């Protein structure tokens, strides 16, 4: 159940006035001014890496190796398969969790920059790191009886 929740709640916002951290669904950050500014150039992307800022961009392709390619505007970003979601390496999360993100916004942090064989700069990103942060700072602190803000997005027909 926890992994299903993580697929939708992995975006962090720090509310300036009271320093409270809130985690919202992917897609909530992509059109914000702060996100657009961070994606505006190489220097702002490097600053986001240094600060471990959670960014959001559209996943454009899932490669044959199940790496996600994200459009960072000025350069390309790659989320390697093992950094795409918690549980991918162990098989607890299936590859469809990555494939289904194509064409949709995904949250990530930039962990490194590399030049490809053609000399083009590529950002190496991690979606899993954001999920782990959400788990450590939010989900693991929930207690039975806690009331959390949520939106029902669809119903699933399954039972015990």
Residue ranges and their predicted role:
Residues 3-160:
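Single-stranded RNA-binding regions, centering on S1/OB-family and related RNA-binding modules
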């Amino acid at each position: 159940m926890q992994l299903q929740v993580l697929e939708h709640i992995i975006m962090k916002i720090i509310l300036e006035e009271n320093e409270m951290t809130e985690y919202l669904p992917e897609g909530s950050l992509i059109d914000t001014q702060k996100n657009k500014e961070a994606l505006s150039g190489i220097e702002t992307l490097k600053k986001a890496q240094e600060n471990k800022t959670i960014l959001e961009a559209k996943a454009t392709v899932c490669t044959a190796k199940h790496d996600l390619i994200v459009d960072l505007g000025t350069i390309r970003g790659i989320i390697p398969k093992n950094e795409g979601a918690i549980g991918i390496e162990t098989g607890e999360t299936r590859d469809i969790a990555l494939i289904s993100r194509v064409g949709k916004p995904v949250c990530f942090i930039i962990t490194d920059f590399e030049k490809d064989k053609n000399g083009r700069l590529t950002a190496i990103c991690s979606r899993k790191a954001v999920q782990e942060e959400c788990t450590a700072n939010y989900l693991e602190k929930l207690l039975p009886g806690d009331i959390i803000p949520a939106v029902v997005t669809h119903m699933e027909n399954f039972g015990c």
